[in-house]
């Protein structure tokens, strides 16, 4: 399962075209499609295995392997909803990295296309929780995103920037790298540790 996702990342970003319209590249397109479908299935199985350890959470559908521009996505994601509506912040699993260095991150975030007038204010509450070791912030402003180290100083800076609308949203994330030869259960154990770290940040969005 983990190796299937690793193999797929070597092809992420490549342009896909329906095989029947690809001419001499038809075989290549069939191959890319199979890689995308296999990797999405593997990611979905991973997400289901994680959700089975947290049955109070409802797993949403995994993202498709191809984006609207018909390129192989550089990552997959799946949201987990415990209560409330899909407009509100949830937890999300997200594949990241390259075939030589990859893993799955867990984050407190929301589905952008589902948000309503309250969503951004709810998400901002993650900054009301003191930092813990291992987390980082993903900061969005002016249509771009960048990582920021999670320190108490940066937490206060981001609260100010959100207040003055210099930043649009801040996600709280933890990356869980996949190590060579790692078995699924051990990886899920690491995701569980991450879940425990992030739960207070999710709970803050519920208040």
Segments (PLM) and residue ranges:
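Short charge-dense sequence patches
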Residues: 41, 68-77, 141-153
């Amino acid at each position: 399962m983990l190796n299937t996702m690793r193999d797929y990342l070597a092809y992420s970003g490549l342009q896909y075209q329906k095989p029947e319209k690809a001419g001499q590249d038809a075989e290549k397109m069939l191959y890319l499609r199979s890689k995308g479908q296999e990797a999405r299935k593997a990611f979905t199985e991973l997400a289901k295995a994680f959700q089975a350890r947290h049955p109070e959470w409802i797993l949403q559908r995994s993202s498709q392997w191809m984006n609207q521009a018909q390129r192989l996505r550089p990552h997959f994601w799946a949201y987990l909803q415990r209560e409330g509506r899909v407009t509100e912040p949830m937890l999300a699993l997200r594949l990241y990295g390259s075939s030589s260095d990859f893993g799955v991150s867990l984050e407190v975030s929301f589905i952008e296309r589902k948000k309503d007038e309250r969503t951004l204010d709810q998400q901002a509450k993650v900054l009301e929780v003191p930092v813990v070791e291992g987390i980082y912030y993903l900061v969005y402003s002016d249509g771009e995103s960048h990582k920021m180290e999670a320190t108490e100083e940066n937490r206060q800076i981001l609260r100010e920037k959100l207040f003055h609308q210099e930043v649009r949203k801040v996600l709280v994330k933890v990356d869980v790298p996949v190590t060579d030869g790692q078995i699924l259960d051990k990886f899920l154990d690491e995701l569980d540790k991450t879940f425990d770290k992030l739960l207070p940040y999710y709970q803050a969005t519920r208040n």
